[in-house]
Swiss-Prot record:
Belongs to the beta-defensin family. It is found in: Secreted. It comes from Homo sapiens. GO terms for biological process: defense response to bacterium. It comes from the Eukaryota. Disulfide bonds join 27-53, 34-48, 38-54. Residues 141-183 are annotated as: Disordered. Residues 159-170 have a biased composition (Pro residues). One of its GO terms (cellular component) is extracellular region. Its main location: secreted. This is Beta-defensin 129. The gene is DEFB129. Keywords: Antibiotic, Antimicrobial, Defensin, Disulfide bond, Secreted, Signal. Residues 1-19 form the signal peptide.
């Protein structure tokens, strides 16, 4: 659920997508409805051509909770302050502020705190990636280029094979009995 929720929320925050199912117009990725007037408990989020995109209180709460608790490192301080429960504030001012900040939220990446290494003037290489998966253990990944693979093949044929390990002789009950009989 944690992995799907950022995708779900980012889709909800994208521009309006009109879908029609049996003549019923929907907006906000199917979570809102296009109507002339919103009900008392609903909020107007976007415009559906000539109508209003109305969203119920559960969807509004879902979006606010995700923005408040799910993505604190992505949002700037202005948005975080706006999402905190405010007293004596007008819902119209908050809605206008949310709509003005949405393009900024959309432009920020969910991977803003991830470190990426960018190498300028890098030459493309053919590479093979090998990963081993063992349940309950750490996964190790080895990457080798085509030239490294060729060198390792040549060096493997030039070097002698490794010596076999010494045989481990474990005392067995039958051997102990035979030694005892001989004495």
């Amino acid at each position: 659920m944690k992995l799907l929720f950022p995708i779900f929320a980012s889709l909800m925050l994208q521009y309006q997508v009109n879908t029609e199912f049996i003549g019923l117009r929907r907006c906000l990725m199917g979570l809102g409805r296009c109507r002339d007037h919103c009900n008392v408990d609903e909020k107007e989020i976007q415009k559906c051509k000539m109508k209003k995109c109305c969203v119920g209180p559960k969807v509004v709460k879902l979006i606010k909770n995700y923005l408040q608790y799910g993505t604190p490192n992505v949002l700037n301080e202005d948005v975080q302050e706006m999402l905190k429960p405010a007293k004596n504030s007008s819902a119209v001012i908050q809605r206008k502020h949310i709509l003005s900040v949405l393009p900024q939220i959309k432009s920020t990446s969910f991977f803003a705190n991830t470190n990426f290494v960018i190498i300028p003037n890098a030459t493309p290489m053919n590479s093979a990636t090998i990963s081993t998966m063992t349940p309950g253990q750490i996964t190790y990944t080895a990457t080798s280029t085509k030239s490294n693979t060729k060198e390792s093949r040549d060096s493997a044929t030039a070097s002698p094979p490794p010596a076999p390990p010494p045989p481990n002789i474990l005392p067995t009950p039958s051997l102990e009995l035979e030694e005892a009989e001989e004495q």
